[in-house]
Swiss-Prot record:
PANTHER family assigned: TRNA DIMETHYLALLYLTRANSFERASE (PTHR11088:SF60)
Catalysis performed (reactions): adenosine(37) in tRNA + dimethylallyl diphosphate = N(6)-dimethylallyladenosine(37) in tRNA + diphosphate
Protein name: tRNA dimethylallyltransferase 1
Any Pfam family hit: IPPT
Binding site for substrate: 12-17
Organism name: Trichlorobacter lovleyi (strain ATCC BAA-1151 / DSM 17278 / SZ)
UniProt-listed Enzyme Commission number(s): 2.5.1.75
Family the entry assigns: Belongs to the IPP transferase family.
Lineage: Bacteria, Pseudomonadati, Thermodesulfobacteriota, Desulfuromonadia, Geobacterales
Gene field: miaA1
Cofactor(s) listed: Mg(2+)
Keyword Transferase: yes
Amino acid sequence: MKPRVLVIAGPTASGKSALALDLAVALDGEIICADSLTVYRGLDIGSAKPTAEQQRQIPHHLLDIREPTEPFTAADFKLAAKAAIAAICQRGKRPILAGGTGLYLRALLRGLNDAPGEDPVLRETLRKRLECEGAETLLAELAKVDPDTSQRLHPNNRNRIIRALEVFQTTGIPLSQFQAEHGFADSPYDSLQFCLDLPRPELYQRIDDRVDAMLAAGLVAEVQGLLQSGVPADCKPLQAIGYKEVLAHLQGEYDHNEMVRLIKRNTRHFAKRQLTWFRSEPAMQWVAYPENSATIHSAAATFFA
């Protein structure tokens, strides 16, 4: 029998962490965080990392396992999450995956394809073009040959933009087509997957409130502390939404009010991309939240019974 795993997904600020905590308490579970930022030590406020009190209440896995300068990929997440799930099940607890990084969830639950088209010389050429011409230029170029992939990517996803162009230019096949045709391996888990669905105005208000709370909690000071500790400004985690705008503000590119406006705007755009991603996941069940949270509790209890 495959291990059973409960998945709570959704856009940023939708309430995933709070719901996962409630479910873990009710189901005697432990939480595995599927988030590309909370894996990094020192990135606490801007990543909305579970608080120390929440971590004392329920064990949370895959938090603070990398330095900001250390790489962490979807493949790394898959390995770490598999080990965490095995350990949780061995203790007789219920594993609950919670997070908004769709690629991590897909890597664990459906697998990752190794696309063809490896060309280090072309990749370096594309990297130099990106530095000179900007990510938006290469993303627009990708949209002409692989619109499905381009719609899922943000200009910050530099490596993935380069990789998608590399695949197309070496094979003539869009990365999205390759993934669709080759499919994914059978999942090693029996999963029950929910995506939290909020009315867009409510979600955007939650985002605005969260950004205000992060700034009040000391997000700017957190970034200053990371820089003072020797974390380079161009390291990957500091290019994430929230951190990169604070960096630009500290470097004098714009004032505090503009920084706040951009963080809120960019986070809203990010949430829309997350929703688009989760809509492509065939096993994901969409649940109106928070009004139907009882439905999730009931289904999860039955699932683990």
